[in-house]
């Protein structure tokens, strides 16, 4: 069976308007991250179908924070890394001393192959580390280009919205202090978090 492309042509559903006062937001599922401060910043936890962009300088701890989140959650998590091997991630995870039986690790950069694994695994949270390493076979340019970042982000956003699976994207910061890639990326996602700290 061919993989779902998670684009608008993949769904047959017709969108219908709902009067604002008839929309039930009490049913919007949120799940706690296992970190009180992160829950507070996210307004009470991760929202189903939300896309979060976590930006920060290289080496500041974005990957470590998200790996810790993946291991603390009592949910099935797929952690996709375009920067580290599965063995490197396992070594970092082992040092944390947290349960590893619900976290799956994939070293991959092509979105079509990632979506094939997502379809097979059906994770409850998808973490992409990082958006700048991804590429779509539908676009000619290389990973990290403006068109690749825009396209791969759009594919992941459509996936999140159509499945209600939250997606966290890691974004690297340039020397100027902005997230690398097109400025539109920050407008495409639901939440942008800037991770800062002392090294």
Predicted regions and their residues:
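Conserved P-loop NTPase
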Residues: 3-6, 10-20, 119-121, 132, ...
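Residue-level signature of catalytic and energy-coupling elements of molecular machines
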Residues: 41, 89, 129, 171, ...
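Structured core elements
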Residues: 53, 79, 127, 169, ...
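Phosphate-binding/switch region of NTP-binding enzymes
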Residues: 154-199
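Detector for small/aliphatic-rich hydrophobic stretches
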Residues: 1-52, 72, 76
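Conserved phosphate/pyrophosphate-binding and hydrolysis machinery centered on Walker-type P-loop NTPases
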Residues: 13, 28-35, 59, 82, ...
